[in-house]
């Protein structure tokens, strides 16, 4: 593809591009592995999109380009999947592609196709994932639907990835289609146990609980019943159980499990560096709305009050002391 075959409004881009690193238009910059189809224009455009010193030049070029020219630029950027990936996986490349999203449906169509071709790789990348997040905000309904379908298909892969879980959380938060939002919440809820035990997935469970969707919270609580105590011994698992205690319906599920375990296990949980926060929260929230459950916990914990004083459970012992003095 020759330069003459791709006229931009910025047709003099080669000559105008800043070249502080001494990279010529015919020599691809570091990070870009050219294919046989690569042209000097590909190399120059790569430099424009990824050079940390080219912010003002990029803004000026975009502001002076009409829709047709932006469409040609989008076509070139997405002409090869590896080339597109080499751009969006860089800090500045990701930011500048995000700036191009939403300019027109024709421009978005090129980017939508490019994202779909490498969806999982893009959405689990530290920088490229923000391109998907932005696309889900500005694309039209048809393109969003295509992306939603891909998100649902790969949702568990995203949830269990350190960068993908962040992208999935943002996508769920901003989801403007009730059907797909419910589908995503249901998928998280039905896989709550697996995700709660995953280093990244637990952040997704924590996040959806903060959305206070009653149906989702109920489903998560049901799917975690019988596992809440085990989760409470773990740092991030305890955060999930604490969130469940904040809503009465799911609180009952957790407290019933606490009351159903043997006293020795509850004592060990109350003395645990993470579990003690779960027990404290259970006491505080049951006291506000379910005194029957509250007194059940007090009676079950009281025989261990001396052991609790000499551990992470000292705060629980203080709560028990305050009620023993009142009685």
UniProtKB/Swiss-Prot annotation:
> Where does this protein chiefly localize?
cytoplasm
Record's keyword terms, sorted:
Cytoplasm, Repeat, RNA-binding, Translation regulation
Domain comment as written in the entry: The pumilio repeats mediate the association with RNA by packing together to form a right-handed superhelix that approximates a half donut. The number as well as the specific sequence of the repeats determine the specificity for target mRNAs.
GO BP term, pick one: regulation of translation
- Give GO terms: molecular function aspect only: RNA binding
**A Pfam family reported for this protein in Swiss-Prot or TrEMBL:** PUF
Write the gene name: APUM18
* Name of protein: Pumilio homolog 18
Whether RNA-binding counts among this entry's keywords is yes
What organism is recorded for this protein?
Answer: Arabidopsis thaliana
């Amino acid at each position: 593809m020759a330069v003459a075959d791709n006229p931009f409004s910025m047709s003099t881009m080669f000559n105008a591009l800043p070249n502080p690193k001494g990279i010529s238009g015919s020599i691809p910059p570091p990070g870009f592995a050219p294919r046989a189809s690569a042209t000097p224009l590909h190399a120059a455009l790569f430099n424009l999109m990824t050079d940390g010193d080219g912010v003002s030049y990029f803004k000026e070029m975009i502001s002076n380009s009409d829709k047709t020219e932006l469409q040609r630029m989008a076509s070139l950027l997405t002409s090869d999947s590896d080339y597109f990936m080499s751009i969006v996986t860089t800090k500045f490349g990701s930011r500048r592609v995000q700036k191009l999203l939403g300019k027109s449906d024709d421009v978005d169509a090129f980017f939508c196709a490019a994202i779909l071709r490498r969806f999982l790789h893009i959405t689990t990348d530290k920088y490229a994932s923000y391109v998907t997040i932005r696309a889900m905000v500005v694309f039209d309904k048809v393109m969003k639907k295509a992306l939603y379908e891909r998100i649902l298909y790969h949702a568990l892969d995203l949830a269990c990835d350190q960068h993908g879980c962040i992208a999935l959380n943002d996508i769920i938060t901003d989801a403007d289609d009730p059907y797909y939002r419910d589908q995503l919440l249901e998928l998280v809820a039905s896989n709550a146990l697996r995700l709660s035990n995953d280093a990244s997935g637990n952040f997704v469970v924590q996040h959806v609980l903060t959305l206070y969707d009653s149906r989702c919270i109920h489903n998560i609580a049901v799917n975690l019943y019988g596992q809440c105590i085990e989760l409470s011994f773990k740092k991030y698992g305890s955060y999930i159980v604490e969130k469940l205690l904040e809503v009465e319906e799911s609180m009952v599920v957790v407290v019933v499990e606490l009351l159903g375990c043997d006293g020795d296990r509850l004592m060990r949980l109350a003395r645990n560096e993470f579990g003690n926060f779960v027990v404290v929260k259970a006491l505080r929230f049951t006291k506000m709305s379910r005194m029957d459950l509250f007194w059940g916990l007090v009676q079950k914990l009281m025989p261990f009050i001396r052991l609790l004083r000499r551990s992470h459970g000292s705060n629980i012992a203080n709560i028990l002391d305050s009620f023993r003095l009142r009685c």
